[in-house]
Amino acid sequence: MMSLLAVLCVLYVWSPAMLTGGLGSTLDSLPRKTVPIGSNGGRLFREEGIWNYTTMLLRDDLNLLILGAREAIFALDLDDITIKKAMLKWEVTRDQQNDCSNKGKDATNDCKNYIRILHKKNDGRMYVCGTKAFNPTCGYLSYADGKLTLEILQEDTKGKCPFDPFQRYTSAMVDGAYYSATSMNFRGSEPVMMRSTEESIRTEFTSTWLSEPNFIHMAHIPEGQSNPDGDDDKIYLFFSETAVEYESYTKVDVSRVARVCKGDLGGQRTLQKKWTSFLKARLDCQVPNTNLPLLVQDVFHLCPDDWTTCVFYAVFTPQSDSSQYSAVCSYKIEDIKTVFSKGKFKAPFNVETSFVKWVMYSGELPDPRPGACIDNHAREKGITKSLELPDKTLQFVKDKPLMDQAVTAEQPLLVKRGAAFTRIVVTTATALNGTSHQVMFIGTKSGSVLKAVNYNGEMVIMEEIQLFDPSEPIKILRLSSSKKQLYVGSEVGVVQLSISECGRYQTCLDCVLARDPHCGWDLDTEHCATINSIHRTRSSTVIQSLNDGDASQCPAIGVSKPVNISFYHGNTVKLGCQPYSNLAQVKWQFNGEPIKPSNTIQILSDGLMIFNASLDATGYYTCSSIETVSQRKYQTQHVAYDVKMWSESGTTASLHHVKEKERTLVAMVVILSLVLAALLIWNLYKGHLSLPCLHRRVKATQNRHEDDANQVQPQRLASSVVNFNSNNNHANDQRYSSSRETDRLSTTAGSTGQMSLKYIDDESEI
């Protein structure tokens, strides 16, 4: 029952309803620009047959990048890593590989020598360690005369380098002393944080101190410098582990930050050769939609000035598949210091015979305070080193190293759904107006790097740069402030990038709306330039707006010249359009009207598809985008197309032209009809034509007179054959036998006045 309550307690603390406040627009941020592999502008180094480029040491004094891989060490030019200065093979022997394989490890992958440790020593040499087929080995590496040389050390390397090449570890070299956090045995079941010196010192082998940890990062903070309390320097350790305070049937992992004092020598009787200053606290990065604590994956510390300004930036990922959110949180050194120096402790409390519950310790603390370094207060009591600490203080630290209060961030700097974050580095950029901004470079599990910055609580991801195939996670990031270069390692190679690629921003709008503190639009040269001291002296000719993204000063952009596109009937036509920003809303228009998707038209992220194109698809297309920044809308026309269809004659035609021809033909028909009507009226008016009704009256009168004529001369008419049908002037083949009869007939017809009308009527039929 108590176990169930413990789990419910964890879920309550991390319930989304408790964590949604204050995040605003940072939840699920989207990169403004996506840069594909072929356009990333980086330099790639890889060697045939070599893998696992995951250990780096920047040697600015030698202008070298020392790169550790699987069974090889490289010295690369720091300005151009494609230039290989030297290479050293450090391979396992056949016997070492067989011995490793006989212990149950995979001969192909596990039983190799993975370079895991690279640190510069005070004398200029480098301390290097490799897994050496599950038999860690260390040595001194030197570079001289264009060659790398290795001196193998015959020393006990347990706890200095991991046995397992795929186990998380961390290390640091501080004033010649080597600090490490890894496992001490072949099985990886003895985790330890230790300092390897003549006075070697380490953690206790107990789950109260370390419970199945994954070590992440180690950092030296010189808190002893100008410290009014006379405090000592600290070594901070970031890791994740199984939470002892949430003991249950289901394991719950949490993130931790621990610290020890640099001058710690261990105890005299209690905690002999063990840390007397080891304290740890839960590290929280609270994100909505997550039911369990996120786990820390990498940490980078940045100190703009002295140690009091140091900030730790950490990336977190979910510990289950129920959430796809990764986050970045930051922690001030003063906040961490306060938890350890003034916070309350947790103590184990036996609830049942098989269950221990950790609760806040409310009793009296020993003096000096457990876990404190030797400071002015301890010196006042006559204690000058940890060997002189009382057993009561040491026993408290041994039993209760866990703080009750967690180290928390105000709110995540960045939350993003999708590929998990893996690594982070941070640099400071000075803007055009002289203000400083912390720019983060975040590696992902999908082989890309995010460039992001926070403006007054608003997180802006300027770009996502794809460096490797999506199946290759980013495994290491290193930043050279002097070279302004980023070095990114993976299983398959290393890429060198400039921290500012302002040339990617093609227009003033694109440059200013990117809100990149490294970049500004130069009105004199009309291109996006890297901000430097020269620009700051003539800031009136450079446009940069980081907090507001105000691009109103940008010159107006003219309408783009249309691109002519022709197609055959039934083709599929694609009209490309790639907006500058993923945050912009794309707007397609056809002959000035918005386009809606249909069975024949599909709007894609990079263009417009027209299926089974016909004459109806011809016309004028435009692609524009509207980007909203700080409630301001900026519209850009990216491309225009004049689309025509090939006709059977081999010429192009558009629906617009066809309709113009149709309208012209209709107009000509109307005009011709009007002309014909006018001619008809004119002929009627002149009497050249008669109406049908008049023709019927004339014909009736003619027939009446013909009857009268037949009554006067019946015999003569009977002996004559005359055709008076309407076509008698054209189809009458009979002739009169004598002109006398013709003359008489003409005279008779003329006396009645009907014959000439008959002839007029016949003409009208023509």
UniProtKB/Swiss-Prot annotation:
SMART domains: PSI (SM00423), Sema (SM00630). This is Semaphorin-4E. The keyword Nucleotidyltransferase does not apply. InterPro entries: Ig-like_dom (IPR007110), Ig-like_dom_sf (IPR036179), Ig-like_fold (IPR013783), Ig_I-set (IPR013098), Plexin_repeat (IPR002165), PSI (IPR016201), Semap_dom (IPR001627), Semap_dom_sf (IPR036352). It is found in: Membrane. The gene is sema4e. It is a single-pass type I membrane protein. The lineage of its organism: Eukaryota, Metazoa, Chordata, Craniata, Vertebrata. Residues 25-664 are extracellular. CDD domains: Sema_4E (cd11260). The chain crosses the membrane at residues 665-685. Residues 27-499 form the Sema domain. Residues 724-750 are annotated as: Disordered. Belongs to the semaphorin family. GO terms for cellular component: extracellular space; plasma membrane. Residues 686-766 are cytoplasmic. GO terms for molecular function: chemorepellent activity; neuropilin binding; semaphorin receptor binding. Disulfide bonds join 100-111, 129-138, 261-373, 285-329, 502-519, 511-528, 577-623.
